[in-house]
């Protein structure tokens, strides 16, 4: 007897509704006579429409012990461009939930777009509850916004080129104040004691050179010694742009602070030399606030819990745009690898993480890493950071880790990426750790770390053009993705997961002591000069 796909669809329909896939309705027996075909009551299907048939047939559940052991090539083979594309469009639709509030799509923390992104990730894992344990880690993220600012010559009203306001700067009403140069970089109290302090109710502006200590320290000390605002000038003579920096978490002494290029700073010093009472007009409209948000952590139920393979991407974007490359691409890659990993057995536990508030200064990943107990810390064998996997004018970037300056194992991770690109005859570029992504908290706490990227605002070493023309802009949407880079790097992520989920053979054992116990915001000499996209020193 031969059944058409239409008849099989009817069988599936009735079998499902009778509660058993093994019940075959009697109307398929040859003796049964049907006056009007039952298909007339159902949506019509073409004989070759196998996908519609499959949708009506419950998929069998394969117990964990029956699954094949994870192999890199087999896991990579399950990564498909169509899946990446579908998830990218999903994220863009979620970013549009913010449009009524922001006037454009965004997934910045605190927005509906970011909240929907987190809901989306959790919904994906609802279908994988037999493979993963999912937890939320809530924290308060420090955020803020510079609405407007003005730094200009008090006499002429002329503003200064490439002046920038520091993130997390407090507001100040417009005022005219004498500009005072602070000696010795303004990092110690004695630097301020050497100048005449402002008189009671007198408003003055401190002019301080960049260097030695974080910008926040300079602002705090200036405020403590009575200055109403601060101008920090760059110490790099070739710099033409302003200082794109952050003050970090403000204190009661923090004052409104802006940055200017080296040449502008030297011009201001010359103006003071000509006129000891030289003054500026200074104003800033801004706010600083705390926003409650969450990290999402998904652990495999199986695998050795004392040998954890950890990897992460950040779930948020900047306010200016939807962030589909930065870091929607990393979010998408991790989700797709997590889905496909469920087809396999593993030897070591795998931990997928989506960090919130990366764009505010790596806040989610730092909160996680700094709040690990010593025992929890020691169980993480490696952390892999996946931020910006698909820049349109991409280069394959690998963090240039070594075991001398970084926790042991970081160099082995770098070599895994190098070997992969070489095996696929792809050129790659080694880039330094600079503090701009979520590996920072792990390295500072002794956990081997590294990662790959495809580049942001810098130029491609091969063609001299910007790597991501839409970096931190509204145009960072689905059209801003390189699908070649996206599929290649997602397969590499799958390779890294499969490799370490199988074995850490040849990988250094974890050191029992934390690598460096430092406060990256307030240390006199931070290990990295950046915190996310912001300079801190």
Curated annotation (Swiss-Prot):
- Give the domain of life: Eukaryota
Q: Which organism is it from?
A: Saccharomyces cerevisiae (strain ATCC 204508 / S288c)
Co-factor remark: Binds 2 Zn(2+) ions per subunit.
- Give the signal sequence positions: 1-21
Q: What protein name applies here?
A: Aminopeptidase Y
Lineage of source species: Eukaryota, Fungi, Dikarya, Ascomycota, Saccharomycotina
- Annotated keywords: Aminopeptidase, Glycoprotein, Hydrolase, Metal-binding, Metalloprotease, Protease, Signal, Vacuole, Zinc, Zymogen
Q: Where in the cell is it found?
A: Vacuole
Please give the InterPro entries that the UniProt record associates with this protein.
Answer: M28_fam, M28_SGAP-like, PA_dom_sf, PA_domain, Peptidase_M28
Is Glycoprotein among the key words of this record?
A: yes
Quaternary structure? Monomer.
Binding locations of Zn(2+) 1 = 314, 326, 387
Reaction equation(s) it catalyzes: Preferentially, release of N-terminal lysine
As for family, the record states: Belongs to the peptidase M28 family. M28A subfamily.
Which cofactors does it use? Zn(2+)
Q: Name one GO molecular function term.
A: metalloexopeptidase activity
UniProt-listed GO biological process terms: protein catabolic process in the vacuole; proteolysis
